[in-house]
C-alpha cells in the first residue's frame, strides 16, 4: 500500500545502494540505516546520520562521505525531490509531492481497509480481558480494561493478527457460593419464609428481584426440593442472571467476546488434574508440610507457590495454570492478559507456570490497567450521587455516553493512572478530545456535501498535482502515517497511540480548514482535487475512530 513506510523503505534501499556505488563500505560493513523524521520540517521529511556511522569504516570525514552518498543516490527511485547536507554530515531528504498526492486515490479506493498491514502475519493471539467476577456490576476499572482491551483487539486485527477475545468466568470460587446462598435467602423471603442472608452475601436490589421472580415462577418448589438440587438451581440461576447483565452492559459498551470460558469447566473436564500431571512429570512440583508446591523460584519468582493446600483444596494459582495450559493447547501463539493493578504481583508466578509447562515465558504478555479517578465540578467523585455506591460502567455510560468513555479510557497508556473529567467528557468544545476528533469528521462530511452541490462528486479525471499548498502537504503526510502508526502501535501493544493519531489528524484538518478556502466555485479543478482529499481524510479518520470503538458522526 502507498504509504510513508514505503518511502522510508525506498530511501533506505537507495542509501545502501549509494554506499556500495561510492565504495564507502562492503555490504557486510554497512550499518543499519536509521531514518528519523525531523521535528523542524525545514530540515526535510526524513534525515539520516549514515555519514557519521560510516566515518570509521570509510576513513573519511562525515561531511565528505555525505557528499559522496548524495552524488550516488537515485532520487527518482526513492520519490525524493531534493537532498541537503546539514551540520557535520546529516543528510536531509525532501519528498516529491507527487508521491504524496498519489495517496489520495489509494486511501479513497482502499476505504475501510486503509491502514491494514500484514505486521502480524496471521499470528494467533488470544486477548483475555475484563474477566470480572459475575457477582455484581462492572466498575470503572473493568470499564477501562474493557475499552483498552477491545481497542487493542481491533488494533491487532487491523495489523494482520488473528485475534480472539476471551472472558474468563470465575464461577468456581467462594463468590459464586455466596451468590447461590444469597439467591436462596431472597427466594425464601419472597415466599414469606424466614431465611437469614449469608454473612458475605450480596445485598443488592437485583438479588431481591431474582428472589421475587423465582417465587412467582416456581412457587415453593425449590423450598421443598432436595438440598443439593435446590443449591445447584440457585447457583445456576444466579450465575445466568448476573452473566446476562454483564453481557448486556458490555455489548452496550460495544465490546463483544468470542469466547466466554467457565472456570468450572476446568474441574469438570479434568483439565486441572492434567496440568498437575504435566508439572509432576516435568519435576516442577514437590510435597512439603502436607501441601503440594510449585517450584516457581526456578523461573525467577520470589518464592515457591502452594498449588494444593494441606486440606486438599486448590489455591487460586492451580486452576489458573490449568486455564493457561488450555489456552496454549488451543493453538494460540501469543496470550495477552489484561489485568487490574492489584494483579501486578501475580505476573512472575504466571510467567513461571508458562515456562514450567514447557513454553517460552514471552508467550504470555500481561498488560496492567491502573485505576480511574472521576472528577466532577473540579472535585474528586468517590461515590455515585444517585446510588451512594461506586460508580458503575452502566451509570457512567448513561452520564457521558459510550463515545466519550471509550475515547477517554483508551487515551492514555493503560499502566498510568487516569483522571476522568466528567464535565470535559460532555463538553462541546475543542478542549474535549473526543468532540474535537468527531467534529473534524463532521466538518469533512459538511465539506463533502458542499462539494456534491458544486457537482464535484460526478467522477472523471482529477488533477492531484494541484494539491501543493503547505497545509495540504501537511495533511497528506499525516494521512500517509496511518498504516505505520497502526503497525507500530500493534507491535508495541500501545492502543493509546491511535487516539493520539486521531487527535493529530483532526488538528491538521482544522489547521488546513482555517488557512484555506477548501472549495472554490471559481477554481473547480482544484476544488475537485481537494474534494477527493477530503474523502481521504474522512476515510482515515473513520478508520482510526473505529479502532477505538468510537462513532464518526456526519453532523454535529
Curated annotation (Swiss-Prot):
GO CC, alphabetical: cytoplasm
Reactions catalysed according to its record: tRNA(Arg) + L-arginine + ATP = L-arginyl-tRNA(Arg) + AMP + diphosphate
Entries under PROSITE patterns matching the protein: AA_TRNA_LIGASE_I
Keywords carried by this UniProt record: Aminoacyl-tRNA synthetase, ATP-binding, Cytoplasm, Ligase, Nucleotide-binding, Protein biosynthesis
Primary location recorded for the protein, binned into one broad class: cytoplasm
UniProt short sequence motif 'HIGH' region, positions renumbered to this chain: 132-142
EC number(s) from the headed UniProt entry: 6.1.1.19
GO biological process: arginyl-tRNA aminoacylation
Molecular functions per Gene Ontology: arginine-tRNA ligase activity; ATP binding
Coiled-coil stretches: none
Entry's localization field: Cytoplasm
Gene3D superfamilies: Arginyl tRNA synthetase N-terminal domain (3.30.1360.70), HUPs (3.40.50.620), Isoleucyl-tRNA Synthetase, Domain 1 (1.10.730.10)
Pfam families tied to this protein: Arg_tRNA_synt_N, DALR_1, tRNA-synt_1d
Annotated family: Belongs to the class-I aminoacyl-tRNA synthetase family.
Subunit architecture: Monomer.
HAMAP family recorded: Arg_tRNA_synth (MF_00123)
Protein name per UniProt: Arginine--tRNA ligase 2
Native species: Bacillus thuringiensis subsp. konkukian (strain 97-27)
Amino acid at each position: 500500500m502507498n504509504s510513508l513506510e514505503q518511502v522510508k523503505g525506498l530511501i533506505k534501499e537507495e542509501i545502501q545502494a549509494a554506499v556500495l556505488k561510492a565504495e564507502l563500505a562492503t555490504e557486510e560493513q554497512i550499518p543499519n540505516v536509521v531514518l528519523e523524521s525531523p521535528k523542524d520540517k525545514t530540515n526535510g521529511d526524513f534525515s539520516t546520520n549514515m555519514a557519521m556511522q560510516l566515518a570509521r569504516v570509510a576513513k573519511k570525514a562525515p561531511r565528505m562521505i555525505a557528499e559522496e552518498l548524495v552524488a550516488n543516490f537515485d532520487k527518482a527511485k526513492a520519490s525524493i525531490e531534493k537532498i541537503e547536507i546539514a551540520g557535520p554530515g546529516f543528510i536531509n531528504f525532501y519528498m516529491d509531492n507527487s508521491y504524496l498526492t498519489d495517496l489520495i486515490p489509494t486511501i479513497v479506493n482502499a476505504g475501510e481497509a486503509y491502514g491494514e498491514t500484514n505486521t502480524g502475519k496471521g499470528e494467533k493471539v488470544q486477548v483475555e480481558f475484563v474477566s470480572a467476577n459475575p457477582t455484581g456490576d462492572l466498575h470503572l476499572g473493568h470499564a477501562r480494561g474493557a475499552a483498552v482491551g477491545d481497542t487493542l483487539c481491533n488494533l491487532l486485527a487491523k495489523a494482520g493478527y488473528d485475534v480472539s477475545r476471551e472472558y474468563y468466568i470465575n464461577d468456581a470460587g467462594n463468590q459464586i457460593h455466596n451468590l447461590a446462598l444469597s439467591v436462596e435467602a431472597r427466594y425464601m423471603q419472597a415466599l414469606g419464609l424466614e431465611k437469614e442472608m449469608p454473612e458475605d452475601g450480596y445485598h443488592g436490589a437485583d438479588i431481591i428481584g431474582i428472589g421475587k421472580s423465582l417465587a412467582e415462577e416456581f412457587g415453593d418448589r425449590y423450598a421443598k426440593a432436595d438440598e443439593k438440587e435446590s443449591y445447584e438451581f440457585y447457583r445456576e440461576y444466579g450465575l445466568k442472571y448476573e452473566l446476562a447483565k454483564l453481557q448486556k452492559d458490555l455489548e452496550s459498551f460495544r465490546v463483544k467476546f468470542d469466547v466466554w470460558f467457565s472456570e468450572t469447566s476446568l474441574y469438570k473436564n479434568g483439565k486441572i488434574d492434567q496440568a498437575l500431571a504435566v508439572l509432576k512429570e516435568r519435576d516442577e512440583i514437590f510435597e512439603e508440610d502436607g501441601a503440594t508446591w510449585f517450584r516457581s523460584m526456578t523461573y525467577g519468582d520470589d518464592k515457591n507457590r502452594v498449588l494444593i493446600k494441606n486440606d486438599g483444596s486448590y489455591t487460586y494459582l492451580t486452576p489458573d495454570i490449568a486455564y493457561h495450559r488450555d489456552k496454549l493447547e488451543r493453538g494460540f501463539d501469543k496470550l495477552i492478559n489484561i489485568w487490574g493493578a492489584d494483579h501486578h504481583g501475580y505476573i512472575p508466578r504466571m510467567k513461571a507456570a508458562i515456562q514450567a509447562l514447557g513454553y517460552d515465558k514471552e508467550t504470555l504478555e500481561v498488560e496492567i490497567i491502573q485505576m480511574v479517578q472521576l472528577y466532577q465540578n473540579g472535585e474528586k467523585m468517590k461515590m455515585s450521587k444517585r446510588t451512594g455506591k461506586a460508580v458503575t460502567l452502566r451509570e457512567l455510560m448513561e452520564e457521558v455516553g459510550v463515545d466519550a468513555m471509550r475515547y477517554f479510557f483508551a487515551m492514555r497508556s493503560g499502566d498510568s493512572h487516569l483522571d476522568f473529567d466528567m464535565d470535559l467528557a460532555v463538553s462541546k468544545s475543542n478542549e474535549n478530545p473526543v468532540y474535537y476528533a468527531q467534529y473534524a469528521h463532521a466538518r469533512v462530511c459538511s465539506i463533502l456535501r458542499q462539494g456534491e452541490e458544486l457537482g464535484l462528486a460526478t467522477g472523471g479525471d482529477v488533477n492531484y498535482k494541484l494539491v501543493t499548498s503547505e497545509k495540504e502537504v501537511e495533511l497528506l503526510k499525516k494521512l500517509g502515517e496511518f498504516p505505520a502508526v497502526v503497525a507500530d502501535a500493534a507491535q508495541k501493544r500501545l492502543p493509546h497511540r491511535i487516539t493520539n493519531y486521531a487527535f493529530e489528524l483532526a488538528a491538521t484538518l482544522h489547521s488546513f480548514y482555517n488557512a484555506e478556502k477548501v472549495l472554490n466555485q471559481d477554481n473547480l479543478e482544484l476544488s475537485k482535487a481537494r474534494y477527493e482529499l477530503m474523502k481521504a481524510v474522512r476515510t482515515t479518520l473513520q478508520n482510526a475512530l473505529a479502532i477505538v470503538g468510537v462513532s464518526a458522526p456526519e453532523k454535529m
